[in-house]
């Protein structure tokens, strides 16, 4: 059996694991990613991120290709199973001091 030597092992290649792997590799850290699924899970489990996360994506160089798959989020309403409004969370549609919109929606398998 071959001995493999990595600085970091990441378990799971979702958006967080993939982003972390890219950031570490950019800093010359050797990374092994372990993912139990052979294919991308086709249903979203995460659907939102903000301008600070977009800055992280900018750092790893994926904002141009990613922007084509994003929706600028004008807000979110949380409604219970009786149709009652629990929370109305409007988001401004203007660029923040981070250089990006404050709220984005996405389809996780696309990321």
Go through each PLM region and give its residues.
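Active-site-adjacent segment of FAD-dependent monooxygenases/related oxidoreductases
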Residues: 45, 50-111
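Conserved structural-core and active-site-/substrate-pathway-adjacent residues in large, well-folded domains
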Residues: 10-12, 21, 57, 111
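Conserved functional loop/turn residues at catalytic and ligand-binding sites
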Residues: 12, 28, 61
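A short, structure-level motif marking secondary-structure boundaries and short turns
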Residues: 4-6, 37-39, 96-101
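A structure-centric signal for secondary-structure junctions around beta-strands
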Residues: 5, 28, 72-75
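Beta1/beta-strand and adjacent pyrophosphate-binding region of the FAD-binding site
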Residues: 2-16, 32
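Glycine-rich FAD pyrophosphate-binding loop
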Residues: 9, 23-45
